[in-house]
Structures are given as structure tokens and as C-alpha cells.
């Protein structure tokens, strides 16, 4: 078997090798920078942080699940679009931790919803439909009937504990937006 000679001139070969080296450096730089940003983000969120609340203003499920969040720090509005395991309802409020050094860097805590006016919610009973628990995520799904309409809701909890499928639970349902509901236990300590 004979290996055919290429038809490239020495100058063309050199240019091809330079392009390969350039693209390799560019690719390496991209992954290094991405890794640096991830580490920098972790560092900024591990120390010198504050907690405030954020409002869900939109969501997207095109390639991945993303919630659009808006929060305010020292009179300045910030918007973030973190990846999420679930789509939450527009108008919900959650706790968000942000870096004091760079308030654009934040992390939402979906296990801590915020209710500003408890009078806007009714307490009713719901039935646990399913539970999911892993090392990083605990999801409780429940069904409820509000004003003769059936609703389903997934919420993220720190731990599922003794909540089992079929158990009856007390939930809080938003009177104007019944799709928004929470496990009453999430607010017992407040």
C-alpha cells in the first residue's frame, strides 16, 4: 500500500499547522476560563454574602429549564436566569443569596419560598402524588382541589422526611393564582 503525497506546498502546510495550534489554544482557553468562572462564583458565594428575595418573572424550557428571576440590591435591579430542575410560576418569590462584592453573582434557594401576605392564601388539604429524593434534590408532588378545579404542584424541599405517597398534607394556596401553592410546613418556623 502506497501513501499518496499531499498536494500542499510547505507554506500551506505551515499555515494548516498554525491553524490547528491556534484552534487548540483557543479551545483550551475557553475551557480554562469557564472553569475559572465556576470557581470564582463558588468562592464569591461562599463568603461575604447577603440574602434577599427574588421574583420569578418568566421561564424557558427550550433547551434546558430556566427561570427568569429579578431581585434588587441597594436600589439596583438585577436579573438572572439560572438552570432549574423545575419551572416555577410567574409571580412567586424565593430567597436568593448574592455576593456583596458582585451582586450579579447569585444563587436562588427554591426550598425557601416567601409569602409576604399570608391573608392572600387559603389553607386547604392536598394529597401527595409522588416523591423524589436524591443527594442534591428532594421534590414533593401533590394534587389539590381549589374552587372545584384540580391542580398539581411540584415543590423542592430540603428533605422529604416522612412524607409518603397518598398522605394528606396541609397546603397554602394563593387565592388569586391557585397554581401557586406551598406546603404549610415550609412556613411553620417563620
Where do the model's predicted regions map?
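Oxidizing extracytosolic/periplasmic lumen-facing domains
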Residues: 1-190
Amino acid at each position: 500500500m502506497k501513501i499518496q503525497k499531499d498536494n500542499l506546498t510547505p507554506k500551506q502546510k505551515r499555515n494548516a499547522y498554525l491553524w490547528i495550534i491556534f484552534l487548540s489554544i483557543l479551545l483550551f482557553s475557553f475551557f480554562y476560563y469557564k472553569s475559572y468562572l465556576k470557581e470564582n462564583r463558588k468562592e464569591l458565594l461562599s463568603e461575604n454574602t447577603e440574602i434577599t428575595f427574588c421574583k420569578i418573572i418568566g421561564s424557558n424550557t427550550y433547551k434546558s429549564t430556566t427561570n427568569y428571576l429579578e431581585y434588587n440590591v441597594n436600589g439596583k435591579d438585577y436579573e438572572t436566569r439560572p438552570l432549574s430542575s423545575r419551572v416555577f410560576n410567574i409571580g412567586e418569590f424565593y430567597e436568593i443569596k448574592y455576593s456583596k462584592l458582585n451582586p450579579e453573582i447569585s444563587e436562588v434557594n427554591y426550598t425557601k419560598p416567601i409569602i409576604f401576605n399570608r391573608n392572600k392564601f387559603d389553607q386547604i388539604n392536598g394529597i401527595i402524588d409522588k416523591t423524589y429524593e436524591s443527594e442534591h434534590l428532594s421534590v414533593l408532588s401533590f394534587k389539590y382541589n381549589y374552587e372545584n378545579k384540580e391542580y398539581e404542584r411540584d415543590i423542592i424541599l430540603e428533605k422529604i422526611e416522612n412524607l409518603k405517597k397518598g398522605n394528606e398534607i396541609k397546603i397554602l394556596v394563593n387565592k388569586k393564582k391557585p397554581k401557586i401553592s406551598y406546603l404549610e410546613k415550609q412556613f411553620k418556623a417563620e
